[in-house]
Amino acid sequence: MANVYDLANELERAVRALPEYQAVLTAKSAIESDADAQVLWQDFLATQSKVQEMMQSGQMPSQEEQDEMSKLGEKIESNDLLKVYFDQQQRLSVYMSDIEKIVFAPMQDLM
């Protein structure tokens, strides 16, 4: 029987070889080479982190913060590079979700 760690490493290499994974890498590289997209990306990451911290501490964003997030979302949607990135991320997430279901199926048997 194959070593489970060897199989996990093989899966990791297979995921990295997926065209969808490569498309996300290409889209990420395009963002990194465009100053405007990079600023929007950094704003998105900072806002996402702030909202996650608020939610974890039981707080909800104020109306002003929600409006700011909405405006940022509109800017992101209007940036072609970021739009492509998020579209490619979504395609990759379908694979990752399917893989997660398969990998964690034995754990469900124990519940």
Swiss-Prot record:
InterPro entries the record matches: Com_YlbF (IPR010368), YheA/YmcA-like_dom_sf (IPR023378)
Highest taxon of source: Bacteria
Protein name per Swiss-Prot or TrEMBL: UPF0342 protein SAG1376
NCBIfam families the record matches: PRK13676.1-1
Ranges in coiled-coil conformation: none
UniProt record similarity statement: Belongs to the UPF0342 family.
Amino acid composition bias (Polar residues), ranges on this chain: 52-63
Pfam family, any one: Com_YlbF
Region annotation (Disordered) ranges: 52-71
SUPFAM superfamilies found in the cross-reference section: YheA/YmcA-like
